[in-house]
A protein has these predicted regions:
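Substrate-gating cap/lid alpha-helix
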Residues: 185-221
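Structural recognition of the beta-strand scaffold that forms the well-ordered cores
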Residues: 53-57, 92-97, 123-128, 176-181, ...
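C-terminal motif of bacterial Sec signal peptides marking the signal peptidase cleavage site
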Residues: 15-18
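Oxyanion-hole/transition-state-stabilizing segment in secreted/luminal serine hydrolases
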Residues: 108-152
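Bacterial signal peptide processing site
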Residues: 20-23
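Active-site segments of SGNH/GDSL-like serine hydrolases
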Residues: 165-198
């Protein structure tokens, strides 16, 4: 390289070195610029929509028996309505309820690994249980009806219901449990059963107390729906609701889900 070329190269190098030094002197250390504040920016609730897994437990009411429109009773109706809630894009339902199931049979069902897996994965649980426990006593004492057998059975039912809640909570401590009360199907046959009406009221009180003690559950009363509309809400078996009866239950469930704060609980699941 010639002498002139060396001079040009040296001058060019000095210029680059000087520029680099200027940039270094003016630049903030990287460690001082790492914190970026997003405190004023909030993610909209529906920015990442939630897929909700809803599980049904219990007896024929949750199964939807008697619904001549085949719309899945109150369970599928309410589940469909949940897609309209903020932050929920899709609802997956898993109905594990079965016609005729009693509380002792539900206790046994909850011991099955596949059922436990479904409960662990649930975001929301609907349950009806107890009607068949009462019917068992009714059938056994049909021609000598007295109140004592119903209250003896109630003692066992309360213990089993507590066991059911305990099992579900051990598997899933967060999902709200929504449980309805019982109604009196005898009213459509005769109005001379005031003692039986008292029995239903006391059983409902036991259910409501258990639900309240859980702290993350919602009791939905439905007894009055069938008292006021007995001539139009029953299926032809005079025991299960028909489609209109399930429509009324749907409305009642939605009202109490809001009152119990279930949307806020589910939103909390979304935010976590």
């Amino acid at each position: 390289m010639g002498r002139r070329a060396w001079v040009v190269f040296l001058a060019f190098s000095l210029v680059l070195t000087g520029c680099d030094q200027v940039f270094r002197n003016n630049a903030e250390p990287f460690t001082e610029r790492r914190d970026v504040q997003f405190n004023d920016w909030e993610v909209p609730p529906d920015f990442l929509p939630m897929n909700l897994h809803v599980v049904g437990l219990g007896d024929s009411l949750t199964q939807g028996v008697g619904d001549e429109l085949k719309k899945g009773g109150y369970f599928e109706r309410v589940a469909s309505d949940l897609t309209e809630w903020e932050g929920i894009s899709f609802v997956e339902t898993e109905n594990l309820a079965k016609r005729g199931r009693r509380s002792d049979q539900l206790v046994e069902q909850l011991e099955k690994p596949e059922i436990q897996a479904s409960i662990k994965d649930a975001d929301l649980i609907f349950m009806t249980i107890g009607g068949n426990d009462i019917m068992k006593v009714l059938k056994a004492n049909l021609f000598k009806l007295k109140t004592a057998p119903f209250y003896k059975e109630l003692e066992g039912y309360e213990k089993r219901l507590n066991e059911i809640f305990g099992t579900v909570r051990a598997l899933n401590p967060d999902a709200p449990i929504v449980m309805s009360g019982l109604y009196n199907p005898m009213l459509i046959i005769t109005d001379e059963v005031k003692e039986f009406e008292t029995i239903i009221t006391d059983w409902n009180q036991a259910i409501e107390t258990t639900v309240a003690l859980d702290g993350n559950s919602c009791f939905v009363p439905v007894k009055d729906l069938f008292e006021e509309n007995a001539n139009v809400v029953y299926h032809t078996d005079f025991f299960h609701p028909n489609a209109q009866g399930y429509d009324l239950m749907e409305e009642r469930y939605l009202k109490y889900l809001e009152a119990c704060g279930v949307p806020e609980v589910l939103q909390g699941e979304l935010d976590r």
